[in-house]
């Protein structure tokens, strides 16, 4: 198993309940294949650097996971097929910090409500 960090952007018109369903689907794939979710963060609705399709904003979600490369490929395949996800990136890392990400720290200092942060060690 290897550590990966995955960030995906969900269309701006998708509700928070639907975002939870998308993340739950990914969580199920990971857990069904003996993977572990170490960190899960919702970064909020953020303005995109450039317009993607009709989207000027997107819901950003971060997953820090311990999985095999086969699970990574399956997750990326599901992300590609999901029309609500407009962009995603998954990279292999040496370790996953138990600290909140810098983006989440900035949100906290700006008094923006944090909806979901989960850190499992």
Curated annotation (Swiss-Prot):
GO molecular function: small ribosomal subunit rRNA binding; structural constituent of ribosome
The keyword Ribosomal protein belongs to this UniProt entry's keyword annotation: yes
Cellular component per GO, a single term: cytosolic small ribosomal subunit
Domain of life: Bacteria
Keyword Cell membrane: no
Keywords: Ribonucleoprotein, Ribosomal protein, RNA-binding, rRNA-binding
Biological process per Gene Ontology, one example term: translation
Entry function: Binds together with bS18 to 16S ribosomal RNA.
Listed PANTHER family: MITOCHONDRIAL 28S RIBOSOMAL PROTEIN S6, SMALL RIBOSOMAL SUBUNIT PROTEIN BS6M
Family: Belongs to the bacterial ribosomal protein bS6 family.
Protein name in the entry: Small ribosomal subunit protein bS6
Organism: Rickettsia typhi (strain ATCC VR-144 / Wilmington)
Taxonomic lineage of the native organism: Bacteria, Pseudomonadati, Pseudomonadota, Alphaproteobacteria, Rickettsiales
